Amino acid sequence: MPKYRSATTTHGRNMAGARALWRATGMTDSDFGKPIIAVVNSFTQFVPGHVHLRDLGKLVAEQIEASGGVAKEFNTIAVDDGIAMGHGGMLYSLPSRELIADSVEYMVNAHCADAMVCISNCDKITPGMLMASLRLNIPVIFVSGGPMEAGKTKLSDKIIKLDLVDAMIQGADPKVSDDQSNQVERSACPTCGSCSGMFTANSMNCLTEALGLSQPGNGSLLATHADRKQLFLNAGKRIVELTKRYYEQNDESALPRNIASKAAFENAMTLDIAMGGSTNTVLHLLAAAQEAEIDFTMSDIDKLSRKVPQLCKVAPSTQKYHMEDVHRAGGVLGILGELDRAGLLNRNVKNVLGLTLPQTLEQYDITVTQDEAVKKMFRAGPAGIRTTQAFSQDCRWDSLDDDRAAGCIRSLEYAYSKDGGLAVLYGNFAENGCIVKTAGVDDSILKFTGPAKVYESQDDAVEAILGGKVVEGDVVVIRYEGPKGGPGMQEMLYPTSFLKSMGLGKACALITDGRFSGGTSGLSIGHVSPEAASGGTIALIEDGDTIAIDIPNRSIQLQLSEAEIAARREAQEARGDKAWTPKNRQRQVSFALRAYASLATSADKGAVRDKSKLGG
């Protein structure tokens, strides 16, 4: 029978000092012996996805206390990728994932907490907390802040839905008037919550459902809706049950590594492919799997991508649907239900509610459930009122979207495409693979061949695109932007958005060892591995070289002879200390970022730290 971890600090005469300090936080004699549960919040006023979280930790804590536990809250940092985008701030985004994971480990282990409730939401916060949870392997429940409502505005006498990406594209399009750009900017992000499309934040919050570590509805129920409050209340109650099951009944099924098993990771990736999630999810699932000591690799993702169809299409891949529409169609469980009927899921998995996948679908799949409360929850909709307050409205759709032939979520028979929304490509300059969000690629450019235009920074590429130096048919290559080379593996949302604003969204390709925002669409291929700074062949591409992309056949090729590539590699090595570094880039890199770069691995490994360099 495992002992409560917290007993280390609450029991024994020699722990009098620790108990004295616990008493100063409000604990009393009756609390010593109860499980101490960390409420890991991520409130910040910098990020709309987190601006409403200040009081939500208190909601969880009250339920923990009422259920027989002791709640202790702390905060992590949270970077807003959209605000950090397009300047040096983006260098810090991915490294913040590691800082978040470490800070959770530090706080939980330093104070011997027994379990956690993780209140996350945006791009690197959910992955960082997920990595920490699987590293620590103590009972945990995730509950995120929820998606933002889609923006709406009237253009050309037509009401259209908007999101952050629309504001970026219109702001860079010289054909758009200042008045229209301003109108879109003011309408794009109307409420608190994670940006309203199937971007990285919402993708990851959906994946925690598929992993079994969060409750049904977590990924899609709007931040503003009153129904979301119940997820927080339930999390506080349920975590005490999970904690007591493990520590008092020796039930290891309550631990995250036994919930988020290899089978659960495969289900999560299957969901990701079917819903056309952000390419960043690949990076984060690979990293989380390593923390869980699960053998889950790019090869597994490649195999899944070849058999899973696309059953859901959401912004940025279409403007018709946003997360509020996914929720109306049944959310994550709606997609999982269709995947299950197609025989594409591992059914022998459980979630934090203790339900197997078939049991969960029976209760929460809107096409089969008899539970009217569940149907009501999935009718939760937007109010269209600007607010930063959680649970501030109770609007509902008149009906559910259960049309699996022409609705937001489709059945296998009516899939958007037989190929899924993500694909792994391999070739002679991506020997370890690269990732493309096929959900956002127009059918006309699934096969694309063109001359390379090579840039050694995102900034140079943006200048060239806006300056008209990139033309129809070009393959833009942005290198030395990987985890080590950036450092920090910047997102390339601005280059892809600016290609669209210049009318080149379906006429060019963009390839990088960096990564893309979940808001990216178009022929945007990232995570090229090995990266340029690690000796990757992408560093040897020159202007004018022909690159051939063949998504249906999962191929990407630099059309040069092996002899020519070998000669260029030899010339690169001859640069000595300057080999595998950008030639003409001026970039200030802080000590913190240099420390990150010194241990960073390529994207095919999840851009985690290289344990072998630390003797691990």
From Swiss-Prot:
Signal peptide: none
Active-site residues per Swiss-Prot or TrEMBL entry: 517
EC number: 4.2.1.9
Keywords assigned by UniProt, alphabetized: 2Fe-2S, Amino-acid biosynthesis, Branched-chain amino acid biosynthesis, Iron, Iron-sulfur, Lyase, Magnesium, Metal-binding
Pathway: Amino-acid biosynthesis; L-isoleucine biosynthesis; L-isoleucine from 2-oxobutanoate: step 3/4; Amino-acid biosynthesis; L-valine biosynthesis; L-valine from pyruvate: step 3/4
Amino acids binding Mg(2+): 81, 123-124, 491
Note describing how the cofactor binds: Binds 1 [2Fe-2S] cluster per subunit. This cluster acts as a Lewis acid cofactor.
N6-carboxylysine found at: 124
A Pfam family this chain is assigned to: ILV_EDD_C
Molecular function per GO: 2 iron, 2 sulfur cluster binding; dihydroxy-acid dehydratase activity; hydro-lyase activity; magnesium ion binding
Enzyme class, first EC level, given as a word: lyase
PROSITE patterns: ILVD_EDD_1 (PS00886), ILVD_EDD_2 (PS00887)
GO CC terms of this entry: cytosol
The protein's required cofactors: [2Fe-2S] cluster; Mg(2+)
HAMAP family the UniProt entry points to: IlvD
PANTHER family, per the entry: D-XYLONATE DEHYDRATASE (PTHR43661), D-XYLONATE DEHYDRATASE YAGF-RELATED (PTHR43661:SF3)
Family assignment from sequence similarity: Belongs to the IlvD/Edd family.
Protein function: Functions in the biosynthesis of branched-chain amino acids. Catalyzes the dehydration of (2R,3R)-2,3-dihydroxy-3-methylpentanoate (2,3-dihydroxy-3-methylvalerate) into 2-oxo-3-methylpentanoate (2-oxo-3-methylvalerate) and of (2R)-2,3-dihydroxy-3-methylbutanoate (2,3-dihydroxyisovalerate) into 2-oxo-3-methylbutanoate (2-oxoisovalerate), the penultimate precursor to L-isoleucine and L-valine, respectively.
Name used for this protein in its record: Dihydroxy-acid dehydratase
The encoding gene: ilvD
